[in-house]
Structure formats: C-alpha cells, structure tokens
C-alpha cells in the first residue's frame, strides 16, 4: 500500500469521524422543531414591472441598498442601472468585455462593479464630478474567470473566481489584501454575512465554506450536495445560509449546528438552480431554475409555496430588496421582472 493510499484512507476516516460527531450533536431535525408552526400557504406574486433594454442574455443583477435602483449585466456588453419604480435607465455603461458574469452595487450607491471571463473586476464610479460614468479601477489578479463580487464598502470588495479562490481587494491600491484558498473546484458564488465579518462561498467541488474576512481563514466547510453549487445566500440573521446546486436541490445549512438542516426539492424538479435569495424575514426561500421558473419555498417546512412563472428562458439571477418589498428576476430572455 503506497503512502498516498494510506493518506487517502486516513482522510476518509477523519471525514467519517467528523460526520459521526456532527450526527451526535443533532438532537432534533428542523422538521420536528417546526412541526407546530402554521404553513405559509399559497404565495402568489404578480409581475409589477418588466425592465426592457438589454439585447442579449442577462447574467447577473444586484439591488442597491435604497431598494429602488438595481444594476444588471448582460451578454450585450452593457451594465444598466435601472430605476425600478419608473423602469427608466439611469445609466447604460458599455463594458470593455461583453463576457460578464457578475455585477454588484456598493452599499453607498457610489459604485458598481462587474467582471467575468476577462478575469478582472472592474469598478465604475457613478458619482463623478463630470457626471459621466467611468472605470475607476480594474482589479486584476485572478487567474480564472470572475464568478461573483460583493462590496464591503467603497474601498473593499470580495470576489470569487474560477481559479478556485476568493479574494479581498483594496480598491484604492488595486491590490489583493487577502486570498481565500481551500476550494478544489471553481468558486461560483459568495454571500456576505449581515455584519460583513464573514462570508460564505459555494463551489464546483460541491462544498460551501465559511470564511473570516479579516483573518483569511476557512472557519467551516459544509458538504451534502452531489454536484456544483451555483448559488449561495446568507439567512437574514447571519446564522445560516442556503445553497442552490446542479443536483436540483437547494439546501439550508446552519453555522451553529455545523450541518445541513433542510433540503428543498421536488420529484418534478430535475434541473439545476442558478440563484437563491431569502425574503426579509427568512421564511421564504426563492430559487431560480434552468426550467425558466422561480420557485418559492417555505424555508421552515420545505414545502413549495409558489412559483414565479413569466420568463421565456432560464432564470439566471434574482434578488430581494433590502426593505423586503420586491423581488427581481433576470433571465436569458433578456428581461428583468419585478414581482411583489
């Protein structure tokens, strides 16, 4: 038996020990604890606005903190800032690379960011003195595509990449201040905790990891999915997070329990999940699917509470406003829809 085989065996044994230790701590299931809670009932949402203007597939969207403006990124090579109340375009920003995969709105509303197959995170200043929007920084350092980015503030942004790492950047200097390495597959998505001290990442190694922003350490690793994790989103209180995967399930993981609490799936759903988001209370989990629909799950009961149907192609991205009053879905059909 070679040394490598021995190490593999040891690693497998350790994994099993961890699994058994977690099981021993699980004194009850979420289903048992929520048995006496009333079901949510049927959730019916209507399309209130359709945002038309992109000429190709929409790949990403992100709400501003004002719950009114949102940014979207499309294969047409444009980043558009929309006013969701009026459906007007506030800015249409031509990109240097049209292969964009992610976009983000800074909490201050001063900046937006985007990136994709160019491996670069481009930061755009929306509040220049001249009134025009221009690139204020190009953050180059990843050796793979940029899959997701989120601002901590106007000078710090976290990115995830196909090079299996995440990174924290100082925007002013354009340098990576911390690299978060540990995944063994492309990192597809990240989500910041409400206090922004932690973030979670989901990757093509089918695992999710919890990271400490300041220390650059992986705090916890969560397994259970059987395929790539495409989307990840923190629970509003920061104690749990949801993931969406190509294995056709969404899952809820709890940081304190250190394990999976719930699986959201249905025999009729056989396609992958592209995006996930919680309602403001956390009671509903919204998930976008490859079959053109967005399913609304009762997060506590794992029942399907509703469906948002209206797109003619894959739902690629979705987001809930900070005030919890609206949901936006973006699709490969080139439209964004606002629901409530």
Curated annotation (Swiss-Prot):
SUPFAM superfamilies: WD40 repeat-like. The keyword Repeat applies. WD repeats lie at residues 53-83, 95-125, 141-170, 182-212, 224-254, 268-298, 310-340. Disulfide bonds: none annotated. One of its GO terms (cellular component) is heterotrimeric G-protein complex. GO terms for biological process: G protein-coupled receptor signaling pathway; positive regulation of neutrophil migration; posterior lateral line neuromast primordium migration. Keywords: Repeat, Transducer, WD repeat. One of its GO terms (molecular function) is signaling receptor complex adaptor activity. It holds the Pfam family WD40_Gbeta. InterPro entries: G-protein_beta_WD-40_rep (IPR020472), Gprotein_B (IPR001632), Guanine_nucleotide-bd_bsu (IPR016346), WD40/YVTN_repeat-like_dom_sf (IPR015943), WD40_repeat_CS (IPR019775), WD40_repeat_dom_sf (IPR036322), WD40_rpt (IPR001680). G proteins are composed of 3 units, alpha, beta and gamma. Guanine nucleotide-binding proteins (G proteins) are involved as a modulator or transducer in various transmembrane signaling systems. The beta and gamma chains are required for the GTPase activity, for replacement of GDP by GTP, and for G protein-effector interaction. Belongs to the WD repeat G protein beta family. This is Guanine nucleotide-binding protein G(I)/G(S)/G(T) subunit beta-1. It comes from Danio rerio (Zebrafish).
């Amino acid at each position: 038996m070679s040394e490598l085989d021995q190490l593999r065996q040891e690693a497998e044994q350790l994994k099993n020990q961890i699994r058994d230790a977690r099981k021993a701590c699980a004194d009850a299931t979420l289903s048992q604890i929520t048995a006496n809670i009333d079901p949510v009932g049927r959730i019916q949402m209507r399309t209130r606005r359709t945002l038309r203007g992109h000429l190709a597939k929409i790949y990403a969207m992100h709400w501003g903190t004002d719950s009114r403006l949102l940014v979207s990124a499309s294969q047409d090579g444009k980043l558009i800032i929309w006013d969701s109340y009026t459906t007007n375009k506030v800015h249409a920003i031509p990109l240097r690379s049209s292969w964009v995969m992610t976009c983000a709105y800074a909490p201050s509303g001063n900046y937006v960011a985007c990136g994709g197959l160019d491996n670069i995170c481009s930061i755009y200043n929306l509040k220049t003195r001249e009134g025009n929007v221009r690139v204020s920084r190009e953050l180059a350092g990843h050796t793979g595509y940029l899959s997701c980015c989120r601002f901590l503030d106007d000078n710090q942004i976290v990115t995830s990449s196909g090079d299996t790492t995440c990174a924290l950047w100082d925007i002013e200097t354009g340098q990576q201040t911390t690299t978060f390495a540990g995944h063994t597959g492309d990192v597809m998505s990240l989500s910041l905790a409400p206090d922004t001290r932690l973030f979670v990442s989901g990757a093509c190694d089918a695992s999710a990891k919890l990271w400490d922003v300041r220390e650059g350490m992986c705090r916890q690793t969560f397994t259970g999915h059987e395929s790539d994790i495409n989307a990840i989103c923190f629970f509003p209180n920061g104690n749990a997070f949801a993931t969406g995967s190509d294995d056709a399930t969404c899952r809820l993981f709890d940081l304190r329990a250190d394990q999976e609490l719930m699986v959201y799936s249905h025999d009729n759903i056989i396609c992958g999940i592209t995006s996930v988001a919680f309602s403001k209370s956390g009671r509903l989990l919204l998930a976008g699917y490859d079959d053109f629909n967005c399913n609304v799950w009762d997060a506590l009961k794992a029942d399907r509470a509703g469906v948002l149907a209206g797109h003619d192609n894959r739902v690629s991205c979705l987001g809930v406003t900070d005030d919890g009053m609206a949901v936006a879905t973006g699709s490969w059909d080139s439209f964004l829809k606002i629901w409530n």
